[in-house]
């Protein structure tokens, strides 16, 4: 219904649909998000946002002191966004986005979510949120979200089993998917449905196969 609404012009009787559609467009965000160049341009235009990003990247031990765009370099070499790194001895060096690690770029882009959720209630979704991130950085991102936002939500898939062992991960937050052998359909179920004792490790229960959602691997020989 909402996808159709975006393509047609309706009268004032459809105000409830218009309001719902506008809310989703503004506050619900898919997995791709803005490009690196889009974010960098926003930082140049918004000092508050730029200061937040630089502070967040420093807290994450990236030592980034500035972000800039070189339009001339972009035209000639494809290098557009540049990161200035500050070293202990006081010297600085600059790397283009092409030369940055995927982990640095991934964490940089994730900061847009936190910045927005600190100011308004948003919903973000990610597929394999841990992609290219050191586990400690993933935890830093998730705990920053948990401790500093009010009514925002993050929906994400992950292959990282270690998260099941974290104290801030409640059982009603965790959902598993298991593929049927018969028809290849996928069943979705919540960890809280198992009624496990509160002292039983969710991580260990999953590792030992009590919760399903594990591939049945054949012999390596």
Q: Could you describe each region identified by the protein language model?
A:
Residues 1-72:
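Electropositive, glycine-dotted interaction segments
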Residues 56-67, 87, 207-210, 216-221:
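N-terminal accessory segments
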Residues 72-115, 120-123, 129-133:
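Conserved ABC ATPase signature
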Residues 1-19, 111-116, 202-221:
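Short, surface-exposed secondary-structure junctions/capping segments
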């Amino acid at each position: 219904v909402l996808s159709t609404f975006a393509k047609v012009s309706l009268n004032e009787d459809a105000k409830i649909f218009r309001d719902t559609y506008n809310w989703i467009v503004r506050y619900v965000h898919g997995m791709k998000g803005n490009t690196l160049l889009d974010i960098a341009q926003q930082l140049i235009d918004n000092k508050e946002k730029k200061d937040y990003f630089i502070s967040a990247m420093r807290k994450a031990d990236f030592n980034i002191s500035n972000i800039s765009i070189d339009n001339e370099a972009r035209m000639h070499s494809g290098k557009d966004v540049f990161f200035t790194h500050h070293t202990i001895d006081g010297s600085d060096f600059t790397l283009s986005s092409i030369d940055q690690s995927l982990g640095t770029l991934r964490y940089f882009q994730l900061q847009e979510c936190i910045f927005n959720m600190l100011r308004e209630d948003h919903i973000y979704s990610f597929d394999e949120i841990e992609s290219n991130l050191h586990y400690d950085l993933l935890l830093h991102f998730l705990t920053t979200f948990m401790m500093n936002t009010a009514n925002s939500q993050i929906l994400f898939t992950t292959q990282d089993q270690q998260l099941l062992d974290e104290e801030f991960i409640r059982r009603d937050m965790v959902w598993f998917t298991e593929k049927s052998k018969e028809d290849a359909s996928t069943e979705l179920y919540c960890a809280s449905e198992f009624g496990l004792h509160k002292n039983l490790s969710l991580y260990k229960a999953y590792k030992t196969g009590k919760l399903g959602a594990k591939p049945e691997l054949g012999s390596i020989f």
